[in-house]
Design a protein with these regions (language model features):
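A structural motif corresponding to the C-terminal lobe/cap of the Radical SAM core domain
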Residues: 148, 154, 170-192
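Extended low-complexity acidic/polar segments
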Residues: 54-65, 182-195
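Electropositive phosphate-/nucleotide-binding environments in soluble metabolic enzymes
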Residues: 13, 137, 182-186
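Conserved AdoMet/S-adenosylmethionine-binding subsite of the radical SAM
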Residues: 20-164, 170
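Radical SAM enzyme core and accessory elements
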Residues: 199-202
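Canonical Radical SAM [4Fe-4S] cluster-binding loop centered on the CxxxCxxC motif
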Residues: 1-13
Length: 202
């Protein structure tokens, strides 16, 4: 947490085996409910060796990893091999817009997405809808085109923009002023369903 006058570091450091033991305490619940463990973030692949060790220790438990896909290809393949389900974030199909808004183009992300598609591994694509940034029908259609011929694709989840983060800004002495219309209606109709993709708007 960061405040105007000081920084406070929160959390507990632990080794992968200790964390795995804690997770496995819920094994009976996982087995009864059909649930499991999801690694998300931040970006879980930023701690690649730790993530791979933990995934191995949790073999037998359903393991899901959510990633932005901007991960070195060898590491992505290793993580993919060790998971049961991938949650793959796609922000925009356009490389220039991706570079403008994130600081990097999406070439590596698209290569990893292609690897994911070819693997046949079950996956879900998640698209955060940011008004005026990536919510155009053109971008949604381009995103749908990226997902053609993907036998492992379970569904596409569109994550509507929400204002929850705005409440945190005053805590760090800042005003919340998003550079877009937060009330805009995303133009996403008819982009995914004609392609036969299951769509969930959250």
């Amino acid at each position: 947490m960061r405040k105007k006058d000081r920084t406070e570091v929160c959390g507990v450091e632990m080794e992968a085996d200790e964390l795995a033991r804690r997770v496995l305490r819920g094994r009976d619940l996982f087995d009864q409910s059909g649930g499991g463990v999801t690694f998300t973030g931040g970006e879980p692949t930023a701690q690649g060796p730790f993530l791979l060790e933990l995934l191995a220790l949790l073999a037998g438990v359903h393991r899901a990893v959510e990633t932005c896909g901007h991960t070195p290809e060898p590491l992505f393949r290793q993580v993919l091999d060790a998971t049961d389900l991938m949650l793959f974030d796609v922000k925009t199909a356009d490389p220039e817009r991706h570079r403008y808004y994130t600081g990097v183009d999406n070439a590596l992300i698209l290569r990893n997405l292609a690897t994911l598609k070819e693997s046949g591994k079950p996956f879900i694509v998640r698209v955060p809808l940011i008004p005026g940034v990536n919510d155009s029908l053109e971008n949604m259609r381009a995103t749908a085109a990226l997902l053609q011929d993907a036998p492992g694709l379970q569904r596409v989840e569109l994550l509507r923009y929400h204002k929850t983060a705005g409440a945190k800004y005053p805590m760090v002495g800042r005003r919340y002023e998003p550079p877009f219309d937060v009330n805009a209606t995303p133009a996403v109709h008819d982009a995914f369903t004609p392609a036969g993709m299951k769509l969930l708007v959250l």
